[in-house]
Amino acid sequence: MTSWVGRSAVEIAAAVRERRATPREVVAEHLDRIARLDGRVGAFRRVRAEAALAEADELAARGDLAELPLAGVPLAVKDNLDVRGESKRNGSAATPDTPAAADHVAVARLRAAGAVVIGLTNVPELCVFGTTDGVHGITRNPWDLTRTAGGSSGGSAAAVAAGMAPIALGNDGMGSLRIPAANCGLLTLKPGYGVLPAGIGGGDWFGMSENGPLATTVADARLMCALLAGSERRWPSRVPPTGMRKVAVSLRSPLLGVTVAAPFRAAVREAAGVLIKAGHQVRRADPPYPASLATTSLTHWTAAVAVDAEGLDPRLLDRRTRTQAAIGRRFLKGVRASTARDTLRRRLEPFFAEHDVLLTPALARRSPAAEPWHERSWLRNAAVNSACSPLSPPWNLTGWPAVSVPFGVLPSGAPCAVQLAGLPGSEQELLDVAAEFERLRPWRRTAPLD
């Protein structure tokens, strides 16, 4: 019997459309894998076993099955997005346990394309931190179960890396897609502002947070983005690759005082070598990050959480979340009036006038141990976030696209990754470069948990 675990969404959908597999067969096999492995990984907060099988049967009876781009593909959804009939807990005991009346638009579009939602994935409380743990347990990296999967889309990333779902939906407010993708060996895109529908929390974290895909292949990520864009046609049209691109390579952390560990610098150097051999014009060049970037990141990050915590019982929040919200309330008025993000864009635009793509490390060091970080102080959590993922915030603050691409392996055996960033509208170009890495340096797609 053919196994569909570890196959891409494109492969699965083609098999279902061609009647080589049924939606029930595909969904049931992934549910079985969840039942066997998720006790070790902790990817899911809620598994929709009966509902998913029923929806798979309904899908099989549709007359347009042969036309659906994601026919029968199991989909994991981050637990801060509405799924009809399911409660959205956002990693917290303080949020209402009330079933959603309708799907979030991003979920609805993927379902309309034939995807079957198999479960809601774990997040840190209010999707704040770079480790996924809290009232719903600890989410571990399937490649190294002693380490966190990262956050805040940690459950979604762990589900895909463990082969429990071929694709997942997550979002990124300060690296929340790219951090867990880099830890778990996945491909992800944080799109630019307004490219894909957001609608995440209170004001999308001042427009910094975007929905996006977690996938094992560039083709799956590209397909998800095209479907998420829907009829709004904001997804950039794909143009044929133009051949040589001007690629800037930077090993520098944007945050002063934070250094990038040697294995992550080495991965970028090796990735640059791959691009040189592929015919691109590659040179070392550091973006002119301002010294104030750390302050801008901190004020916007904490203020966004203050907005999301409004109306929630503080007694039910984790200590680190309460502290973050309290700090953010002090900055809220200033952030709403701030022009710091416009200043950052103006500062970086001349750099990208000279370069098509920026290549950097995706992370500065390996992910922290899989431990109850939610029981520790806010300061300790913030310090770990800054130390591990200083290269994510600039692209949320600017609202520009960034991609995390698996590249190489760390000394521990866990995946390593690089980051690609560009100007607004460069999403397809960044994915084209990611596809070159995929072709020239293919990565392992599923963690060997069996």
Report the location of each language-model feature.
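Short glycine/serine-rich loop segments
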Residues: 102-225, 397, 401-409, 414-417
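Short helix-loop capping/hinge segments that flank enzyme active sites or metal/cofactor-binding pockets
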Residues: 70-90, 244-250, 299-349, 361-365, ...
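Acyltransferase
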Residues: 23-28, 57, 262-286, 309-314, ...
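Immediate post-signal peptide segment of exported/extracytoplasmic ligand-binding proteins
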Residues: 59-74, 220, 240-248
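Glycine-rich, small-residue loops and helix-cap segments
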Residues: 19, 30, 72, 112, ...
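A short helix-breaking turn/cap at a secondary-structure junction
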Residues: 190-266, 270, 289, 441-450
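An N-terminal boundary/leader segment
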Residues: 1-54, 273-280, 349, 446-450
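Acidic/His- and Gly-rich active-site-bordering loop/insert found
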Residues: 52-54, 62-135
